Amino acid sequence: MLVMIPKDKEYRLIKIYMYICDMYEQSLKYHCQRYSNNSKPLFSDEEILTIYFFVGHEQKYTLIKDIHNFAKEYLRDWFPNLVSYQTFNYRLNRMAGAVRELSSQLLRMFRPSDCQDDTVIVDSMPIITCCGRNRTGKVARDIADKGYCSTKNLYYHGLKLHMVGYRRKGHLPHPCQIALSPASENDLKVFQSECM
C-alpha cells in the first residue's frame, strides 16, 4: 500500500528542498565538501538536509531514528535512494559545519527590521545532562563536563548554551549567534573566542 503525505506538506517539502539546493550550491558545499571518490553519491547531502529539516519541522521529531523512520515510511516516493539509518546518521553528523552555516544564514536572513544594531544582549544558560549524586554523565561525553550555575546555585554535569541577540523594544531579542561549550568554561572566554 502506498503511503503519502498531504499536498500542502508536499509543497513545503519541495520548497525546503529547492531552498537547501540553492544554499548548498552557494556556500554549504564548502562546509561539508567531499574529498573522496564518492563525491556524487546516489543519495545527496541536499536530500539528507531536506529530510532532517522537513521532518523535524513538520512532524516535530527530534530523534534522528524517528526522522529516518518517518522518511522510510512516508517519503520513500520522494527519496527512492534513501540510505540505511546508520549511513544517514553518519552522514548527517559529518554535516555539522553545513548545519551551523545554514543556521547562521537563516538567522541573518530572517532578522526583524526593529533590531537595534548598536545594542546586543549576551546570555548563557545551563543544559543539564545529569545532576545530584551522579558525578559523570553518559550523554555527550566529548563536550560535557562539570560546571556551576550561580543563578540557580547548582553544580551540574552538562553544557552551556550561549547566545548573542539583537535588542528589540517590546519583544524577545533576535539571536544573531548561538554557541555550545562545556559547562566548566568561563562565559567571557567563550564569547571572545566563538561569538566575536
Question: What are these model-predicted stretches?
Answer:
Residues M1-M196:
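Short alpha-helical elements
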